[in-house]
Amino acid sequence: MTKKDKKPKISTIVTKEGDTVKVFEDLDTFETFIKNETEDEEFDHVNCHLKYYPPFVLHESHEDPEKIKETVNSHNRKFVRHLHQHVEKHLLKDIRERLQLPQLKFNDKSKEETPDHIVWRYNQRANFHERDFDIHVTVECHHDSALVDVDYLTVPVPAVAAA
């Protein structure tokens, strides 16, 4: 019986521009982080990156990433359809719940498809504790892997000075 891998599931990197980005390796840690940031009043300055295998992919491979078929990628229609459903019905819903913003609908959405990848972009302006901020969620799948990249960014909206 082998021991589970005990490496950290979160790391922090600093970009060339000096921005701090939290990088996550699993969905649960990512969602917990978002919930904690909301409780800590840091919800409007968050920059996260999540790289993970979607739950439906792990389920099909019996929770073993080594058993994921090579054909599970952005060229596989079934994978793309299931990923889109996962994003719309689970990931965005979980973000909405973690932020405690039931009115969050992500109506501003787009899809970009190239031979190398598919990208879905979801944007929404929100208000929480009397503070306006923009939420940007970008989900990307690639032609060579079942790994999915999610970028989650919140940016405060500058308050307009009263005349």
Curated annotation (Swiss-Prot):
Any GO BP annotation: energy reserve metabolic process
Compartment annotation: Cell membrane
Keywords: Cell membrane, Membrane
Signal sequence interval, chain numbering: none
InterPro entries, per the entry: RGI1, RGI1_sf
Bilayer disposition of the protein: Peripheral membrane protein
Main localization category: membrane
UniProt GO cellular component terms: plasma membrane
Family: Belongs to the RGI1 family.
Function: Involved in the control of energetic metabolism and significantly contribute to cell fitness, especially under respiratory growth conditions.
Name of the protein this chain belongs to: Respiratory growth induced protein 1
